[in-house]
């Protein structure tokens, strides 16, 4: 049994398979998941698990080069936006409109659906390299 890091076997497998610039999405419970993209559904009830809890665990186990967020999060969910900026200090940040964000999710290797039920609590993580 693993002692630390991501214990969820599906998430651990996706993280291990990522190459440089590949993307994964951590999403609230309302983000549409495009056909053909792997869905890892962690939601058990509204708010559980939280977006920020899942983001922290994944970020601790992943080399992240860039982060993409919907620009609407700035005005509609400032608290989550601030927490993302505090948790992910090193990667570059990119903000796009929500419609563009949803288009970008079509290229993701996987979308991790949380129980989060606050607006625009979604992030695209772009894989970096460890060297």
UniProtKB/Swiss-Prot annotation:
One Gene Ontology term from the biological process aspect of the record: D-ribose catabolic process
Enzyme Commission number(s) of this protein: 5.4.99.62
Name of one Pfam family that matches: RbsD_FucU
Domain of life where this protein originates: Bacteria
Keywords per UniProt: Carbohydrate metabolism, Cytoplasm, Isomerase
Gene Ontology terms: cellular component: cytosol
Top-rank EC class of the record's enzyme: isomerase
Catalytic residues as annotated in Swiss-Prot or TrEMBL: 20
Gene Ontology MF term list: D-ribose pyranase activity; intramolecular lyase activity; monosaccharide binding
Catalytic activity: beta-D-ribopyranose = beta-D-ribofuranose
Pathway per the UniProt entry: Carbohydrate metabolism; D-ribose degradation; D-ribose 5-phosphate from beta-D-ribopyranose: step 1/2
Subcellular compartments: Cytoplasm
Function: Catalyzes the interconversion of beta-pyran and beta-furan forms of D-ribose.
Subunit structure, interactors included: Homodecamer.
UniProt protein name: D-ribose pyranase
Species this chain originates from: Bacillus cereus (strain 03BB102)
């Amino acid at each position: 049994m693993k002692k630390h890091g991501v214990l969820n076997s599906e998430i651990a497998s996706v993280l291990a398979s990522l190459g440089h610039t590949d993307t994964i999405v951590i999403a609230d419970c309302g983000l549409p998941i495009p056909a053909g993209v792997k869905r890892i559904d962690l939601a058990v009830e509204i708010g559980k698990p939280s977006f920020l809890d899942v983001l922290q665990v994944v970020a601790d186990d992943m080399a992240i080069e860039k982060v993409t967020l919907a620009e609407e999060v700035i005005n509609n969910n400032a608290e989550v936006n601030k927490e993302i900026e505090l948790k992910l200090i090193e990667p570059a940040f990119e903000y796009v409109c929500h419609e563009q964000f949803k288009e970008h999710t079509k290229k993701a290797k996987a979308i991790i659906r949380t129980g989060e039920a606050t607006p625009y609590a979604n992030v695209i993580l772009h894989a970096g390299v460890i060297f």
